[in-house]
Design a protein with these regions (language model features):
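Short, conserved alpha-helical segments within structured domains
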Residues: 49, 79, 106-108
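Hydrophobic/aromatic-rich core segments of domains that either
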Residues: 40, 85-145
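Hydrophobic membrane-insertion alpha-helices, especially the h-region
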Residues: 1-8
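Extracellular pro-sequences of secreted precursors
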Residues: 12-13
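Alpha-helix capping and helix-coil boundary motifs
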Residues: 8, 45-49, 131
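Periplasmic OmpA-like peptidoglycan-binding domain that tethers envelope proteins to the cell wall
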Residues: 74-89
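Secondary-structure boundary elements
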Residues: 18-77, 139
Length: 145
């Protein structure tokens, strides 16, 4: 998969053409407790932690909505979300566990990338400033990343 144009989202509001993407990343108590619960049996194993959080998010049903991205808590409570809702949930979980992760916006889609310093997986990745970022797709189901 080759992306000729993409945006790394680092700000709460990112203007893209005629629209604005609203980043709903949360590092609150709710998200911290959820991340801790999802990773409690991982014993600080990075791959286990990331995979457990990704599995949780991908099990939430995908449903397109026309509103701005929802908060992580709202996505869990309503038990559905589109790519931006589910990506906001995943990146929030990753951030509270201190992982370096970013949103990537491509035409009509958003996904998460993560840097796993010192871990070399045999997986597709994006390179940003000579740093390897693995792609985490929140809309995939039953797929090991």
């Amino acid at each position: 998969m080759i992306y000729s144009s993409f945006f790394i989202v680092k700000n709460q509001f990112t203007d893209i053409g005629d629209s604005t993407y609203v980043n709903q990343v949360r590092v609150d108590d709710y998200t911290k407790k959820l991340a801790d619960f999802l990773t409690k049996n991982c014993k600080q194993d990075t791959i286990c932690e990331v995979q457990n959080m990704l599995d949780f998010v991908t099990q939430i049903p995908y449903k397109i909505n026309e509103s701005i991205a929802k908060s992580p808590k709202k996505v869990v409570e309503q038990n559905f979300g589109d790519c931006d809702d589910k990506s906001n949930l995943l990146i929030s979980l990753l951030k509270v566990k201190d992982y370096e992760a970013y949103f990537v916006l491509v035409p009509n889609h958003i996904f998460v990338i993560i840097n796993l310093e010192g871990i070399n997986l045999n997986k597709k990745a994006l390179y940003v400033n000579n740093k390897k970022y693995y792609i985490l797709e929140t809309t995939a189901t039953k797929k090991k990343q």
